[in-house]
């Protein structure tokens, strides 16, 4: 979303728009589907980014949590189609989450075991669940009032179900 905003600002400047007009346009931007969609409930802030996941987009999404208030929690699933370095790339995402100050990482999916390993190796807290249903069942015990939660995985993981469960807490 940041890159799109910067590109939009550049186009706006080239068309003679003022900084105020550009800022107003960016402030009113709404994402499509589950691409960096920020949802607010009376209890939580949820960043639902379930459409696609790769190491760079996941790292950027984790970094964006710094802009939001609340305890930082990531609910992460497998990033698919990464090739032969899949485990190492998942582990690096986990390390990045811990280094960024994420207090809790919840994962499901075989590949996401490496995310948990990365979180733990960097001194963070991570929980791995055998399937999405088990993860969803654990949400009421692990999520607190005021949490800011990133939900991100490759689309085939169907993490929109996790977002729906969080909205119902």
Residue ranges of model-derived segments:
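ATP-dependent carboxylate-amine ligase
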Residues: 7-169
């Amino acid at each position: 979303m940041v890159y799109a905003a910067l590109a939009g600002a550049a186009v706006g400047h080239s068309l003679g728009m003022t900084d105020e007009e550009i800022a107003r346009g960016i402030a009113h931007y709404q994402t499509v589907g589950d691409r960096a969609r920020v949802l607010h409930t009376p209890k939580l802030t949820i960043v639902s980014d379930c459409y696609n996941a790769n190491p760079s987009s996941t790292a950027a999404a984790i970094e964006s949590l710094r802009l939001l208030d609340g305890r930082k929690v990531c609910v992460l699933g497998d990033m698919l189609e990464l090739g032969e370095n899949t485990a190492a790339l998942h582990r690096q995402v986990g390390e990045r989450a811990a280094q960024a100050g994420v207090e809790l990482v919840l994962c499901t999916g075989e590949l996401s075991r490496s995310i948990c390993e990365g979180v733990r190796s960097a001194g963070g807290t991570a929980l791995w669940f055998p399937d999405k249903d088990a993860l969803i069942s654990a949400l009421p015990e692990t999520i607190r009032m005021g949490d800011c939660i990133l939900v991100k995985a490759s689309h085939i993981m169907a993490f929109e179900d996790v977002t729906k469960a969080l909205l119902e807490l």
